[in-house]
């Protein structure tokens, strides 16, 4: 009996250290911004399965948020009403513009009437942008992922649930570009997406989360009013709208882990 109690205590300690469920929640008046990429089944042996949230898991996550009374907003709505949102406001975001955002994620969002923002790379087809960050990531895995075509982007934009934002022309690593090239990535993508959806594009996501103060200023110059990073956390009541933090949702997270991330803002 003593042995069993000892084992249970050890397991409980390990669980508590891993998940820190006991930590107090970040004030629920502070909105949460979630970062997703794909909603699709995992690929055996694939490098980027952490970017792939299984549809059944995504359904559970959105269903739980809905049941808990979360208020879903787009990024522009988040900015426009900052400080006046109800408790438990959440902005779901997707990076890159994968086809599964329409085929798998959108029906779930529609089912729960949950709004989201999709940051689209303009030149997104057959492009292995993972090599722009790390040259050895040259497997072509992301290049082979089907992307949204322009008609589908417009369809999502007209759905009433989806805001389309920019993720540059080529998913560029802005840190490797000079001022002129960086500004072109920012402005051209904005203009082309606006021409496609016939709406202003005001929301932006820094590719790879790699950026400097120069890029913040260039994004403002290009006409964006808010931008998200990959820095994990929950912003304060008075945030820098051009450097908003997000909560990363991994394809390897359990629902329990996702709940804790929403509570604490990052992996415990």
Describe the function of each predicted region.
Residues 113-135:
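A short, conserved beta-to-alpha structural element at the edge of catalytic cores
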Residues 51-55, 138-147:
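A short acidic, glycine-rich active-site loop
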Residues 66, 107-113, 146-165, 220:
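Acidic (Asp/Glu)-rich catalytic clusters
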């Amino acid at each position: 009996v003593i042995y069993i109690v000892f084992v249970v205590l050890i397991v409980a300690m390990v669980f508590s250290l891993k998940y820190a469920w006991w930590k107090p929640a970040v004030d629920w008046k502070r909105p949460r911004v979630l970062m997703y990429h794909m909603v699709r089944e995992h690929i055996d042996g694939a490098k980027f399965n952490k970017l792939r949230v299984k549809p059944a898991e995504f359904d559970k996550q959105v269903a739980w948020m809905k049941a808990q009374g979360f208020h879903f907003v787009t990024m522009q709505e988040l900015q426009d009403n900052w400080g006046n949102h109800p408790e438990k406001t959440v902005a779901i975001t997707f990076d890159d513009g994968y086809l599964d955002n329409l085929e798998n994620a959108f029906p779930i969002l529609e089912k729960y009437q949950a709004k989201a923002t999709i940051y689209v790379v303009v030149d997104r087809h057959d492009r292995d942008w993972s090599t722009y960050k790390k040259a050895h990531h040259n497997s072509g895995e992301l290049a082979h992922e089907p992307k949204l075509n322009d008609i589908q982007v417009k369809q999502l934009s007209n759905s009433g649930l989806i805001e389309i934002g920019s993720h540059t022309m080529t998913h560029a690593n802005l840190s490797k570009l000079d001022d002129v090239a960086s500004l072109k990535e920012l402005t051209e993508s904005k203009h082309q997406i606006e021409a496609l959806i016939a709406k202003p594009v005001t929301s932006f996501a820094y590719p790879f989360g790699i950026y400097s103060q120069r890029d913040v200023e260039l994004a403002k110059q290009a006409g964006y009013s808010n931008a998200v990073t990959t820095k994990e956390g929950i912003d304060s009541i008075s945030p820098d709208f051009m450097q908003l933090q997000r909560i990363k949702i991994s394809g390897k997270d359990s629902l329990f882990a996702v709940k804790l991330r929403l509570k604490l803002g990052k992996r415990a």
